[in-house]
């Protein structure tokens, strides 16, 4: 856990405070929104098992979600719609969701730590951290909030569009998902720009 705080502690020691971590879930799927979360944890907060959301089981993420919400000084969660993804492109839509999440914070961050290698569209001072969801506590927390929130949304979509199996693959391009699209056609929440390469 202390390793997850090493970068943030350096920045805090330089007098920059508070920091927020920002991450997204849902850039790659063929269907559904992209979700982003921004989190400001108390400096040095210990949340056991906090790590990159992709390495955690669904049950563990759900438990950590509640602990993060209860521990955070501030958090924001937001979406960009399928229409916005199609109109702009997935990268611009991701930045839109990230900015919306940051805007929802009840505390304005002095610096946003963004998972990945691009931050040109972020509306507050920011810094990229490649692999940040495994390196920074605030980003790891944001990763979990975004992933759990988007997964819950896709479970709702699975009830609305039961023929696609969204509850299993959450909209990602599995063989079963492609087969369902070929059989019944795309739904209203499919990203048509992502389906153009289908044969």
Give a label for each model feature.
Residues 1-199:
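RNase H-like, Mg2+-dependent phosphodiesterase core
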């Amino acid at each position: 856990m202390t390793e997850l705080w090493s970068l943030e502690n350096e920045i805090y020691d330089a007098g920059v405070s508070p920091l927020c971590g920002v991450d997204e879930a849902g850039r790659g799927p063929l269907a559904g929104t992209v979700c982003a979360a921004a989190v400001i944890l108390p400096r040095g907060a210990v949340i056991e098992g906090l790590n990159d959301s992709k390495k955690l089981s669904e049950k563990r993420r759900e438990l950590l979600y509640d602990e993060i919400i209860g521990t955070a000084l501030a958090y924001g969660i937001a979406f960009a719609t399928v229409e916005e993804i199609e109109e702009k492109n997935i990268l611009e839509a991701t930045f839109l969701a990230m900015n919306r999440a940051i805007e929802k914070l009840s505390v304005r961050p002095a610096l946003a730590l963004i998972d990945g290698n691009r931050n040109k569209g972020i509306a507050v001072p920011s810094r990229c951290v490649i692999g940040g969801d495994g390196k920074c506590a605030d980003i790891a927390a944001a990763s979990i909030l975004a992933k759990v929130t988007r997964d819950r949304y896709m479970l709702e979509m699975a009830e609305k569009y039961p023929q696609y199996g969204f509850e299993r693959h959450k909209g990602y391009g599995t063989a079963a998902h492609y087969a369902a699209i070929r059989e019944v056609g795309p739904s209203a929440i499919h990203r048509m720009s992502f389906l153009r390469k289908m044969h």
